[in-house]
């Protein structure tokens, strides 16, 4: 495991727990404590982590140098993403619960998509389930890519959550966009696509059909 991945795992655990112990890291990585201890010692010698003893065991904290290493790694990933521009995601069409229709019936979102994406979407989303590893990796890359951001909007008695969007094509049809509402209940393996077209009708898409998305990041 690379130093960056181990540091990222420690940071991830620290977001869930007040203190991260060596045992927690070993359990999370399914590695022996001896192997984890050797790796942590190397990181400590490079001033990337600090180790201290407590009644819970050995506590691990990431240093400023460790955080900087992680930030540099993330910057390189972003640079790679920017240079690639297009991310292909394949998925199979699936019926949603009607949430997309409700979401797109709200004037704020309709007006915002028209303003930021240049089109007024059909009142409904095309939901796709990602089924292959490369497509899922590309989907996850979008999480750290620069998106078109629809800001959160406060109304009198409710708050409409922010949305991240990426211009896209659907089976080569444009315009369209992949959208990620920040309050979505969907897992990472499900994406929502909007377009001014009724995509199922326009492209004759049925549940289970493979759909190819080209997302522009």
From Swiss-Prot:
Per UniProt, CDP binds at: 96-101, 197-200
Pathway given for this chain reads:
Cofactor biosynthesis; FMN biosynthesis; FMN from riboflavin (CTP route): step 1/1
Keyword Metal-binding among record annotations: yes
Region annotation (Riboflavin kinase) ranges: 87-217
Name any Gene Ontology BP term: FMN biosynthetic process
- Cofactor annotation remark: Binds 1 Mg(2+) ion per subunit.
Query: What keywords sit in the KW lines?
Result: Flavoprotein, FMN, Kinase, Magnesium, Metal-binding, Nucleotide-binding, Transferase
Q: What are the EC numbers?
A: 2.7.1.161
The record's listing under InterPro entries reads:
HTH_MarR-typ (IPR000835), RibK_CTP-dep (IPR039063), Riboflavin_kinase_archaeal (IPR023470), Riboflavin_kinase_CTP-dep (IPR023602), Riboflavin_kinase_dom_sf (IPR023465), WH-like_DNA-bd_sf (IPR036388), WH_DNA-bd_sf (IPR036390)
Task: Give the protein name, as stated in the record.
Answer: Riboflavin kinase
Residue positions binding Mg(2+)? 125, 127
UniProt lineage: Archaea, Thermoproteota, Thermoprotei, Sulfolobales, Sulfolobaceae
Query: Main EC class of this protein?
Result: transferase
Family the UniProt entry places it in = Belongs to the archaeal riboflavin kinase family.
Cofactor requirement: Mg(2+)
Q: What biological function has been recorded for the protein in this entry? A: Catalyzes the CTP-dependent phosphorylation of riboflavin (vitamin B2) to form flavin mononucleotide (FMN).
A single Pfam family it belongs to is: MarR_2
List all membrane-crossing ranges. Answer: none
GO MF, any single term: nucleotide binding
Ranges where the record places region H-T-H motif-like: 1-86
Q: Where does FMN bind?
A: 184, 192
Q: Which reaction does it catalyse?
A: riboflavin + CTP = CDP + FMN + H(+)
């Amino acid at each position: 495991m690379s130093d960056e991945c181990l540091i990222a795992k420690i940071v991830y655990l620290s977001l869930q727990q007040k203190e991260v112990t060596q045992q927690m890291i070993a359990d999370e990585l399914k590695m022996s404590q001896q192997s984890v201890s050797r790796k942590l010692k190397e990181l400590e010698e490079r001033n990337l982590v600090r180790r201290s003893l407590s009644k819970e065991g050995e506590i691990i904290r990431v240093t400023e140098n460790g955080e900087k290493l992680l930030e540099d790694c993330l910057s390189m990933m972003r640079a790679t993403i920017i240079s690639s521009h297009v991310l292909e995601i394949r998925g199979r069409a699936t019926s949603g619960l009607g949430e997309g229709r409700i979401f797109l019936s709200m004037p704020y979102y309709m007006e915002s998509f028209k303003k930021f994406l240049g089109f007024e979407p059909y009142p409904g989303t095309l939901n796709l389930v990602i089924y292959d590893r490369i497509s899922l990796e590309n989907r996850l890359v979008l999480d750290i890519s620069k998106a078109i951001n629809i800001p959160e909007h406060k109304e009198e008695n409710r708050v409409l959550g922010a949305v991240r969007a990426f211009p896209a094509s659907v089976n080569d049809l444009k315009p369209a966009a992949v959208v990620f509402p920040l309050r979505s209940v969907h897992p990472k393996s499900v994406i929502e696509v909007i377009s001014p077209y009724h995509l199922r009708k326009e492209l004759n898409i049925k549940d289970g059909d493979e759909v190819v998305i080209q997302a522009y990041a």
